[in-house]
Amino acid sequence: MVNNEIKLRGKVLRAYVNDDGHLVVTLAVLHPHYVDGVNIGSESVFRCVMADRKRSESLDVLEGDSLEVEGYLRLDRHLSVSGREHKNLTVYMEAAHVCA
């Protein structure tokens, strides 16, 4: 079974804490990146959510920072009020740190 592990390093375009207390980061990645050891390309933008609320509180991330992320990719599906299905590819961060 593929577990969609991913490691990314990129520039933070947006960072905020959502209503549930989780850090959410929009990350621009300009180098090749890998999922389960397979190169999935470069020059991508990812929505990243810190899986653990306590880690969200301890991590100080600002727009423009260089951030390294480890976690896993997941396709989230939900229905809108009108009944249309929406799909979002999200990186759930298990670890992250700001790079110098």
Where are these regions (language model features)?
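Single-stranded nucleic acid-binding surfaces, predominantly the OB-fold ssDNA-binding core
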Residues: 1-100
